[in-house]
């Protein structure tokens, strides 16, 4: 396995001849993920409930299980109700309502379209709950996600980034050549996980950087 590089540190613009496939994370690359903003929109008149939902739902112990595909929203809402006391309906509102208030990150979509124009294969690699992923990709933003050629999502393979297994599943499922692939993620440890498995990385850590890179 050849040594992987961080493209955002090595190059000012995309080295198109160096890659055949570009892999995109979803949250904060293509779709905004900002739980503190979501709870304000979902529970606008109750600051305490906003804080509790942020801690109990988005920052709570069950969230990795949603991503891994081992726990559904209905079951989780009941568990949260029994543990913390808010109504089941409140937890379901927090678990499902955020999907309706997540806006696209246009910078990420411009990058994806540019990659497609350059003849590159496009894939997804994301930690995502099944219900949320299917709502975004098959309903709310179905036309946008149609540009992708496939990918690996945590809820289906039951691995979460940055576990090695999810990158190996991506390579296998999408028939990737790691040294000809770059992965874009907003979380550095996930980028480093890809690089550990031979895939080049790109850490999206500030607004505007993808517009400058994918020109």
What would you call each of these model-derived segments?
Residues 2-58, 196:
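Active-site neighborhood of HAD-like aspartate-dependent phosphohydrolases
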Residues 37, 61, 103, 131, ...:
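Short alpha-helical
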């Amino acid at each position: 396995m050849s040594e992987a590089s961080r493209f955002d540190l090595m190059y000012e613009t995309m080295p198109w001849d160096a890659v055949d496939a570009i892999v995109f994370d979803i949250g904060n690359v293509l779709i905004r993920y900002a739980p503190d903003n979501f709870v304000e929109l979902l529970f606008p008149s109750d600051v305490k409930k906003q804080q509790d939902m942020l801690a109990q739902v988005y920052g709570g112990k069950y969230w990795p299980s949603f991503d891994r595909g081992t726990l559904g929203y209905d079951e989780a809402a009941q568990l949260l109700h029994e543990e913390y006391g808010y109504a089941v309906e409140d937890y379901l509102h927090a678990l499902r309502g955020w999907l309706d208030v997540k806006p696209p990150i246009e910078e990420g979509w411009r990058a994806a379209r540019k990659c497609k124009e350059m003849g590159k294969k496009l894939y997804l690699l994301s930690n995502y709950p099944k219900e949320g992923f299917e709502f975004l990709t098959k309903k709310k933003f179905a036309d946008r996600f149609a540009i992708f050629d496939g990918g690996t999502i945590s809820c289906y393979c039951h691995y979460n980034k940055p576990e090695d297994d999810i990158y190996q599943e991506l390579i296998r499922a999408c028939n990737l050549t790691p040294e000809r692939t770059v992965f874009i993620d907003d979380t550095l440890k996930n980028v480093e996980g890809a690089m550990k498995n031979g895939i080049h990385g790109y850490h999206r850590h500030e607004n505007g950087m993808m517009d400058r890179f994918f020109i």
